[in-house]
Amino acid sequence: MVACFDLPGHTHRHEAYGAYKAGRAQIDDNLILQLERAKNVFTAFGVPIYSHPGFEADDIIGTIVHGLKKEKNLETIIASGDMDALQLVDDKKVQVYTLKKGISGTILYDEKKVTARFGFPPKLLVDYKGLR
């Protein structure tokens, strides 16, 4: 198990596109406190925490997942509210556990569920999002 967090400040995406996340609401102070508490809990349980200036947590998750794909019998489950993580789903080897609409339910996405939701496999999500 590992945990990945965004760091404050701009990322390489802001440099490439100045309006990146320009329409996004400011993060709530209570959420910031909850994230800090979560980091403390992860640290207390010895869970490694990864962050890197200029990169978002999902970039780091993608890098870790890519490195783990070489492991033959390793199943990876990503727990994230960021639906961009669905692009990492790879048959039964990589799945994404996320919230359904709202916070009342959860869903574990495998390749079949991603395809059912979007009408195409996870590997095409990057192109789809780029064209939207």
Descriptions of predicted regions:
Residues 22-132:
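Extended two-metal-dependent nuclease catalytic cores across DNA- and RNA-processing enzymes
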Residues 1-5, 9-21, 34-40:
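Extended, highly charged clamp/arch subdomains and adjacent linkers
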